[in-house]
């Protein structure tokens, strides 16, 4: 049952991330809009994870589905890394540095803030 909980949560999180990328996609700025979608997904997943870790749910399978499944499927380190490399390859070093810095700072901040708010 744990496997099913993670699989369903992961499928839902992945579909959320894909939907967000479709919602924000623009043909005239594909890397910019893809990076924005990844940033939003990672920050939102970090916030959800922070809140869930501060107040674990009584149902361990639901907790597993949300933490490992949804947060894991919604966030993406691999896409974030690939997009940062693409910014460098286009010669946009400052955008790459800004993207990496914003992604890390906002994700850590969102997770810490959500944890603090939920832990009260």
Task: Say what each PLM segment does.
Residues 1-120:
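Membrane-interface helix-loop junctions in multi-pass transporters/channels
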